[in-house]
Swiss-Prot record:
SUPFAM superfamilies: Pyridoxine 5'-phosphate synthase. Pathway: Cofactor biosynthesis; pyridoxine 5'-phosphate biosynthesis; pyridoxine 5'-phosphate from D-erythrose 4-phosphate: step 5/5. Homooctamer; tetramer of dimers. 3-amino-2-oxopropyl phosphate binds at N7, R18, G191, G212, H213. It is an enzyme of class 2 (transferase). Belongs to the PNP synthase family. The record marks E151 as: Transition state stabilizer. GO terms for cellular component: cytosol. The gene is pdxJ. 1-deoxy-D-xylulose 5-phosphate binds at D9, H10, R45, H50, T100. This is Pyridoxine 5'-phosphate synthase.
């Protein structure tokens, strides 16, 4: 049965829109855990557009579940991760001009650098995941580089409908099975919401789904704890 990682970046987005102290994403992480979140996900971007360094340090000290740090594989971020020691790190591509992460890592073009970065984190007892598109080549490179996990990018699945969405779902399923055969743990995320999550959650051996925007959007109407509970129920009711 898949677990639920709640991404709280969008709480920090609201705070940073006014450069003030509220809403505090650390407080909302607590509410997400009350609602059933199995882990808390944050993306510390190089431009610090939402999550700040203080958020990371406080989350590490206060949350009761697990902390998943999304970050680019830069020297600065590697050093921060080794100071904070999150439960796991998810390496993601990052472009300053993007609104949100637009696609998976291109592992093929960065094999040697990523091997070094992954080994560096693992030497500090941090498990490492690669955020990748559901492609066999990327999964094989994930194994070669030495990642513990992969997170399959579900953004294309989320945007499609009908037979096109079904085809993308099959690609995600096949990617999950390939990764499992290689000994990789499989997570998934990006664009998942209350209408499309169940088919992804029902994939055999899907480990965790990382979801943020749809939960926070619904929380504006019904509150964060309840919105997390509803999503958790959809994931676990298969």
């Amino acid at each position: 049965m898949a677990t639920l990682g709640v991404n709280i970046d969008h709480i920090a987005n609201v705070r940073q829109a006014r450069k003030t102290v509220e809403p505090d994403p650390v407080q909302f992480a607590f509410l997400a855990e009350l609602g059933g979140a199995d882990s808390i996900t944050v993306h510390l971007r190089e431009d610090r557009r939402h999550i700040q360094d203080r958020d990371l340090f406080l989350l590490k000290e206060t949350i009761k579940t697990k902390l998943n740090l999304e970050m680019a594989a830069t020297e600065e971020m590697l050093e921060i991760a080794k100071k904070i020691l999150p439960d796991y790190v998810t390496l993601v591509p990052e472009k300053r001009e993007e609104v949100t992460t637009e696609g998976g890592l291109d592992l093929k073009s960065n094999v040697q650098y990523l091997k070094k970065a992954v080994g560096n984190l693992q030497d500090s007892n941090i498990e490492v995941s690669a955020f990748i598109d559901p492609l066999g080549e990327q999964i094989n490179y994930s194994k070669e580089i030495g990642f513990d996990f992969i997170e399959l990018h579900t953004g294309k699945y989320a945007k499609l409908s009908g037979s096109d969405q079904y085809k993308e779902l099959q690609r995600i399923i096949e990617s999950t099975y390939l990764a499992n055969d290689l000994g990789l743990v499989v997570n998934a995320g990006h664009g998942l919401n209350y209408n499309n999550v169940k088919k992804i959650a029902s994939i055999n051996n899907m480990n965790e789904l990382n979801i943020g925007h749809s939960i926070v959007a619904r929380a504006l109407a019904i509150g964060l704890e309840k919105s997390v509970r509803e999503m958790k129920s959809l994931i676990t009711s298969n």
